[in-house]
Structures are given as C-alpha cells and as structure tokens.
Amino acid sequence: MTAKEYINRRAALVGQAMKINKKFFPRCVKAKLRQIARLENEYRGADYETRKNELYKEWFN
C-alpha cells in the first residue's frame, strides 16, 4: 500500500465515522474505528489493540 492509498483510505473511513451519529449508533462508530486501527496496523505497523483503545478514548471522551 502506498502512502497516497493509505491517506485516501483513512480519510474515507474517518469521514464515514464522522457522519454517523455516535449518540444513537455507537457500535457503528466503533466498527469504523476498528477499521482505522486495522489500516494503521497494516500500514504503519502500529499495535492494533493499543491504537484501537487510543481511538476509542479520542472519539468517546
């Protein structure tokens, strides 16, 4: 995966997550955050669980 592909895919996932009303659909938002964490794990080699938890804290606090 190239840097441009990563940026485009991540931007699309973040955009989709931002459009979801997290008050009524928190599980859907968490699913998108898991996809973002999985993508970052694949591209950057970041630890999936750690990054997933960081994203949860960032989006839900």
Enumerate the language-model features and the residues they cover.
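Acidic, low-complexity, intrinsically disordered interaction modules
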Residues: 12-60
